[in-house]
Amino acid sequence: MKQLTRIISMSLVAVAACFTASCSAPSGYDGYMTRPYEIRGQHYQPLSVNEALTYDETGIASWYNESSFFGLKRGNTSLGEKVMPWHIIAAHKTLPLPCRVKVTNLDNGKSLKMRVNDHGPFIEGRIIDVSPRAAKKLGFKKQGLSTARVEVLSVGDGSYKKKRPRKKFLFFF
């Protein structure tokens, strides 16, 4: 009888362990990723969550080369996600992954919210790389580059959001 109780107990522990493992965060990150990395000998340290939530920068935006989507170079982002040209995604050198940003093309006023899920661009003077579809929606796909403003909206799984000023309402009676 003791042996049967022991087998049942061990089985329950094994089932509980499997259930717990299946509920953990996918893609190897717990909410967000701020691990330092190195590309071509250059060291990059992603911003902390608090620093990222105040991030608001203007600079040059570019878009991923489409040939890398359809050739042998098709691959995964830094989070291990598949890259497809129709996704509205972006890459940034120092923002924690993933995060949501609003990119505004300052040449034409168009803006778009997108998910940053990769590191890059690694070309001097550029602040963000967007997918071909995002570049088309922002109106700079033909030009290749644009002056853009990048504002962080949230970091990670959405738990960390930029605080917006509360609107004050005046009531007149």
PLM regions and their residue ranges:
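Secreted/periplasmic proteins
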Residues: 23-173
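Sec-dependent bacterial lipoprotein signal peptides
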Residues: 1-21
